[in-house]
Structures are given as structure tokens and as C-alpha cells.
Amino acid sequence: MLGAIREPPIDVQIALHSRDDNQTGLVLRGTRRTVDRVLKGLCSSPCFFCSVSLTMATLTTTMATTATMATTEASKPLEAQARTALTKATNYAWEIFSNRHWCGELESNVTVTCEHIFFLYVLYQHIDPGEGSQYRQWLLSQQNSDGSWGIAPNYPGDISTSAEAYLALRIIGMSTDSPELYRARTFIRAAGGLSKMRMFTRIFFAEFGLVPWTAIPQLPAEFILVPAHFPISIYRLASWARSNVVPLLIIAHHRPLYPLPNGLHKQNPFLDELWLDPATKPLPYGSSDPTDPVAFVFTILDKALSYLGGLRRSPTRGYARRRCVQWILQHQEKAGDWAGIIPPMHAGIKALLLEGYKLHDEPIQLGLAAIERFTWADNRGKRLQCCISPVWDTVLMIRALQDTPASLGIKLDPRIADALAWTAENQHRGPEGDWRVYKPNIPVGGWAFEYHNTWYPDIDDTAAAVLAFLTHDPATARSRLVRDAVLWIVGMQNADGGWAAFDHENNQLFLNKIPFSDMESLCDPSTPDVTGRTIECLGMLRDLLMRPAENAENGEKYGYPDGEGDAAADAHLLQIINTACARAIPYLIRSQEATGTWYGRWAVNYVYGTCLVLCGLQYFKHDPKFAPEIQAMAARAVKWLKQVQNSDGGWGESLLSYREPWRAGCGPSTPSQTAWALMGILTVCGGEDRSVQRGVRHLVDTQDDTLSQGDGGAAAWTEREFTIREPLHEASQRIGSD
């Protein structure tokens, strides 16, 4: 049964690297390192991704398997090797621990860096030659052999990504006669030329006069005035779309025109060589399906707005613009960030400048400083991260390290306590949060994955943080920190029983039919992967609350209120948890595919979703109400995981599975996906299982000690594919787009 939303993968497929990375290899050739995820895989629990996180997932799987492998004589050599790999991965994790937490580079494809070059040229009409050289080095390192740039490593060229890279390289002074741009130009023209650009690329190009603003769907500023309870309002958009759309309302009103190196032109010929017909520059206005009544209505509405001049002369326009500016300023963090991601930072600054702000004004200066914190430069060149994930990296690493054997002494390591204290300090307690629009009365207590993003905590990070605290000290089950986080999580549950990433009931999927949305990523509905991690968190907490209360050594540090932990309080929280899980499990039953898998929106794809759901369901497999169904579902899921195991013992799955579900579980083995698969299988099978043994063998054999910057006692894993998806950057494209 199809219970997940099928949208094409988003272009920001993230990889993380240690800032100490001295490798000269490209992401295309596999320089991403796996710590957290693989660590967790060698011991057992789900993770996201970083140069940190992949190793941890593998490490954790090792420990879950070695605990049972010891009973089998034939497995002892593998057990010893797994423990050695675990020790090396743990050492590597400590190598990259800094300032009480972990944070690796989040690397995307080239679009976010290209758009940063556009942004800098808009502001200054100049790119520093030294800086431009670093950007050029990075962009060219990501170019495919056919001259294109893809939405992820090892994927075919994408015309919009390639067009943005071509323009960025031209802006920083690269000649059209260069062999790199010749090959890029050849690819773009062969793919249909600039007529095939996606909508967001058109917006950037319209700002330079490369395409007319009439080729952009109408975005009337009055959209900000639509009440939140209407079916269409800014709050019906996903958080990542909302934070981009509000400043775009201002930009679309002004329809700015900025110069390029050849000057200011309303019809700029700067990229005429990329058009098949530069005399007419045809731009189809969208691909709305005329047989779809919703898409047809949106198209007619857009044409009517265009006929009316986009309501620019409306008497409400001045008020709407002021409301947009007010919203932008209100949502700017004290540190200058917007939503913790780069696209709304670029758009927010441009919108404020168009409304009369100056470069020296405080909101602009803070925003520019925030953007600069996202830059990353090393011997591979300079690029811009779309976002950063220190909370995510840290809580997953904490949990993975704590699943290591007692002989390593991790639980007693003071650095773990420091990391937990750092995490506690980053719990959200303030009045901010767009989630309050629809859920104003639930307690605050979530976490965001970035340093500065008080407006958008997310359920996935919050559940992962709670799991880290519970794993470290079971007594935190009765802490205020955990209680508030769990009450916030439960309060964000959707009517269908599942959880989304950031929002409540953000499921108006018809919004993906608007002409502006050619990436189908405007909503944040329930997904099995987030729901799986959430019930894992709730299931672990439920089990701990059913045990006798224990005194936590660090109770005051984590905010234990006086009198907390009594039987009545425990019973009340247990009732809330049981009610939420009784709604979530039927959602997961409905969303299991016929193959036995679950869809994963936030990482690739069915391997990831299936792992997270299995890790959650394991806490309920003896529940009298759901036990038979859960056990049957888990058996089908594990059977599928074993069926798709690669001949080398690992697991892999490509981004193509989002477009073509028959590709589920198909792809070259990666450390992260191998770790995820092992974590899922280990919820049903023991370490002596042949698939588990083969998977652990693959991880042990692929560990790479050359990744360490130390004396040889540390090692990690190289990830050659992008295995997570990130709809936070609105530069999304379709796999194999026309």
C-alpha cells in the first residue's frame, strides 16, 4: 500500500566532511566519510550523515552483532575484527570532536555555490579574483566528463544545474573559449538549451535580464495577507518553502534588473550561446497537466494575475509589502540567520535591499555575517554549504558512542557529558516558532539541527536528541528536558497518526500543482522514516517509565523539576505516549509497501525508511493489540532487506528509486546504507544471521585508516554516493529532468 508522498529527489544531496579534510579527491569520486552512521550500524540505531555520522552508524551495528556473535565459534575472528574497527572508528570520532560537539561539512551539488556567486555579484558587481579562483576550482572539480553538472555524484547531467554553473563561471571571468565551458555549452545545447530551465533557475536569470520576468509565474505580495486557516496561505507551505517564498514576494514585486560583466541590459545577450534560438529565446510557461483540474485552475489564476499586472497597482500592495518586510525581520535570528539555510538568507537580504535597506544596516550586516559562516574552503576550493547540522551530528554521535562496549569506557568519558550539556543548552525554550500558528498550546521543547534556527525545530532532531539522553542516563526519562521534548513531539502528531519533519498538518499537496512549483516540494506531510524514529523515541521512553524511578547523577544539569518522577506524573506521560503510538502504528501499517518496505523521504530511500520503521516497531512487537501485525510486517521487511543485499555483503540504493520504485534497494554498496540495513535486520535477527555476518564483514573490509589525521589508531569509511536528501534548498530538480 502506498502510504508515502512520491516527489522527485531534491538537488541538495548532502555529504559531510571533517574540516581537517586534506583529500584531493572529489565528492564525485567518493571523498565523503562515514562515521556516525556506520558506527551505529556496527552497534545498532539509525543516523543521518556526516564525516562524523557514517562511522558511528557502522560502529553501532558492529556492537549489536558482536554481542551475539560471541556465541558462535566460527564467528570469533570476525568479532575480533569488528571490535578493532569499532575502536578505530571511536578514535576517529574523538579526532573530529571540537568545542563540545561535532559538526561536519554539509556538501551539496554546485547550485548553492553558483547562487552565492550570483548573490555576491548582485551586491558588489565584482568578485574578488582570489576568491573567484577558489570558487572556479571547486566548480570545475564537480564537472562531469561530458561537460555537465549533475544533481548528485555519479548522476547524469542536469540542464538547470549546468546552466547555473556556466553562468557562475562566466561571472568570475572564465572565457567561453575554455575547454570546460565549451563542453558545458555543448551539453546544455544538446539537452535543449536554456528553454528547459527549471523555475528557480529562471528567477535567478531574470534578475540579470537573461530571461524576461514574464516567464516567471505571478507571486503577488498579498499572499502574505491570506489568513493561516485558509487552505492556501504561507503557513500551508513547508517551512523551507515558506522561508523562501516570503522574500520572493518582494523580489517578484520589484522585478529587479542587475548588471552582468557586459553591463546592464533588459534583454541581456550574455548567455546567448546557450539558446538554440537566441533571436526568440522561447520559454515554455510551465508544464501543468491540462487534464488535471487543480493544475488547470492554478494556471488560469496565474494568467489572470498576469493580465492584471500581478496586482502591482492594488491598493493593498503597499501594506502587503510592509507585512512581508515585517515577517522577514521577525524571522531573522539574533545571529543573522534565516531558517538556518542559505536560500532564504540570500533572498531575505535581496528583499530588504529592494525595500530600501542599505548594505550598512544591521539586518543586512548580520545576514551577510551569517552567510559567511556557511562558507567552506580547503585545498579543493571554496564553496557554500546550504545548511549545517551540528545538533544532528552531535546527538547521533553521542548515541552511537554510548552503544560501544563498556570496556571502551565511553559512558564515563567527560567529553560525552560535555556534548550532552551542549545539546541541552541548544534545546528551544523561547517564544519563536512557526509551529505555534497551528499548535499554540503545546509545550516548547524541540531542537533544530542548526546552530541558529529558533523558528524551525524539527521532530526528527528532537526524537534523536531524546534518544541520546535516554541512552546515556535512563533516569533522564523523568527529566523536564525529556518531558517537554516528548510533549512537543506528541503535540505535533498529524491526524493520520504520522509525523512530518517540521510542521503539523502540512499536507495540502494540491499546492504542488501551482505553476511556480516545478519541483513538487512545497509540503511537509507525514513520512514513515520520521514516524519510525519518533516511535523509537517514544517506545524507549515508555519502557523506561515503566521501570522503578532511579536517581540521575546529573539531574539538576538537565533540569529535573522538584517532585518530578512520581507515579502520577509517570502514568500521565505513559498515557500520552501510548495514545500517540496507538495512532502511529496503524499509519505505519497502512504505509508499508507491497514489497515489505517503507519509503524514506529524508535519506535514500527504502533501505533508510525500512530501517527506521523497524527500529521503532521493535519496541511494540509484543504489544497485545498490534503484535501479530508488527511481527508479520517486520518479517516481510527483513526478508526484503536480505533479498536486496549485494554480492559484496553490503547494501546500496540510488536516488533513481524515488522516480522508479522498482529500483528500491538497487545500487552499489555504501557504508551508510549497509549500516541502515543491518540495524533493521538486527531488530529481528541475531548476530549469527548470515546476512548480518556478510554485512559486518563488508564494513570491516571497507574501513579506511588513511582518512585519519592522527597516528594510525583511527579510521573511518569513504562514502562514494549521496545517500541523503535535503529539501531545504529550493534548487530542486527532477532526476532525469526533460
Curated annotation (Swiss-Prot):
Keyword Metal-binding among record annotations: no
GO cellular component terms given for this protein: lipid droplet
Active site feature: D460 (proton donor)
Gene3D superfamilies the UniProt entry points to: 1.50.10.20
InterPro entries membership: SQ_cyclase_C (IPR032696), SQ_cyclase_N (IPR032697), Squalene_cyclase (IPR018333), Terpenoid_cyclase/PrenylTrfase (IPR008930)
Result of knocking out the encoding gene: Impairs the production of fumihopaside A.
Mapped PFTB repeat ranges: 132-173, 321-361, 482-523, 581-621, 634-675
Domain of life: Eukaryota
Pfam families in the cross-refs: SQHop_cyclase_C, SQHop_cyclase_N
Phosphoprotein found in the keyword field: no
UniProt entry keywords in alphabetical sequence: Isomerase, Repeat
Residue ranges of coiled coil: none
EC code(s) of this entry: 5.4.99.-
A GO biological-process term: triterpenoid biosynthetic process
Pathway in which the depicted protein is active: Secondary metabolite biosynthesis
Alphabetized GO MF terms: intramolecular transferase activity
Site (Transition state stabilizer): W392, F449, W602
PANTHER family xrefs: TERPENE CYCLASE/MUTASE FAMILY MEMBER, TERPENE CYCLASE_MUTASE FAMILY MEMBER
Family statement: Belongs to the terpene cyclase/mutase family.
Protein task: Squalene hopane cyclase; part of the gene cluster that mediates the biosynthesis fumihopaside A, a hopane-type glucoside that enhances the thermotolerance and UV resistance of N.fumigata. The first step of fumihopaside A biosynthesis is performed by the squalene hopane cyclase afumA that catalyzes the cyclization of 3S-oxidosqualene into the hopene 21-beta-H-hopane-3-beta,22-diol.
Name assigned to this protein: Squalene hopane cyclase afumA
Gene label: afumA
